[in-house]
């Protein structure tokens, strides 16, 4: 019990492995748990246990993901590893496993491969903020110049997708050797260096409570003699009685004052991230607010109609469409608490999108919705999920 309490004092950070198939992501994940367990306690997870990743559902999509934990001197890491390429794509787009940073695993023997590139691009598109590189299988390369070359290639690739390639930590090692307990430079010490790189290169994540206030509107009702109450779950920030908020989305933005905060029918001084709250709004009529809008700190979020997004389209087996869709496809986009119709514009040279594909699209909604980059959404047809996406850029 005492140990459990002690654990909470360490800062919690979410990471994951990305990179090409067979470059050693799962072996590295196992090595991190082993070295972590030996140094700071915790549980060693063997390769087979991680590889047999259980299936989960996120936004109606089934994804195989393995979750492991390990500790460093200053942090507690929750780490995700996916068995297949398709699982990575789905994971990153749905945000099923939010990452504060990623470990890019690249084989020193092969150098960057197609999925290396695709995972870096996806990391950029979906807003993974930091990448640390592990150059794996370094024991298979005798030529020091070749190692330098591969390292340069990886740095160039990172820079190409707007990561700081020149300043990114690249650790050379062998995950397999580390698992075997090898104490040479590329064995266990390499894993320790990688853990240190995670500690120093990935900054402390910003907590939801420290961000500007935002609450998606789920329900609106009027209480006679008191006014209009809006209910929802506070997504981020803190709201106090007397605070000014903006009502954003669907209609022109308006301002009001919060005159009461309630939770479970009790009056409070404030509500914060994670709370299911009811907010009493001054001088706002019942028909001036609707589900799908958000209440937010003034100036912190704007409503947009047009945006670029990275999208994953469910396969037929996943319960998605049985046929491809084309330019001008008009499904519903489910963002936070609202379904809103939008038109899809495909990139030049892409004629159609097959179920199971991932693609970058431009979307035009019929009404503006409060959103920013990194906003996740589901794509639905008649209430059935056919895809998932994340806003990579707002246009207008």
Swiss-Prot record:
Residues 81-84 are annotated as: G3. The keyword Heme does not apply. Mg(2+) binds at residue 26. The lineage of its organism: Bacteria, Pseudomonadati, Pseudomonadota, Gammaproteobacteria, Lysobacterales. GTP binds at residues 19-26, 81-85, 136-139. It catalyses: GTP + H2O = GDP + phosphate + H(+). GO terms for cellular component: cytosol. Residues 10-206 form the tr-type G domain. Its EC number is 3.6.5.3. Residues 60-64 are annotated as: G2. The gene is tufA. Belongs to the TRAFAC class translation factor GTPase superfamily. Classic translation factor GTPase family. EF-Tu/EF-1A subfamily. It is an enzyme of class 3 (hydrolase). Residues 19-26 are annotated as: G1. It comes from the Bacteria. The keyword Kinase does not apply. Residues 136-139 are annotated as: G4. GTP hydrolase that promotes the GTP-dependent binding of aminoacyl-tRNA to the A-site of ribosomes during protein biosynthesis. GO terms for molecular function: GTP binding; GTPase activity; guanosine tetraphosphate binding; translation elongation factor activity. Monomer. This is Elongation factor Tu. Residues 174-176 are annotated as: G5. It is found in: Cytoplasm. InterPro entries: EF-Tu_GTP-bd, EF-Tu_GTPase, EFTu-like_2, EFTU_2, G_TR_CS, P-loop_NTPase, Small_GTP-bd, T_Tr_GTP-bd_dom.
